[in-house]
């Protein structure tokens, strides 16, 4: 997996090799380029079948999330959530660990923030699962979803000074 800089929110800096993303104060108006309000970036490779997984190293502070998003989220012009803009993710926000979709937040209590997260996608089963990669322990699995034949992209959100996500 590599990050697609053309999908990066203006407040995010993607490394030249496409392996990491970090937060930086905006040099331009984020709404001017048709980006949503979320400081996120997508992976270059779209997934339409099979199983795949990737690991990321995350910072223990700040706010970040990792997961997958439908192709329709790739270039959205509006900031409101609709069923066409689905995502399945997990992350840290204000010290609380969450499982997040476009429509809901599920608090994950008694979870120690992992150093590395493994995202696992089974396209045919519609399954997205997250693991503590160091402990090889399951953190959360979303109920089966239908991806409706659309491409699914790795999705990364970084939201605060000092937050960074690096692909392993």
Predicted region positions:
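Beta-rich ligand-recognition domains in immune and ubiquitin systems
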Residues: 1-168
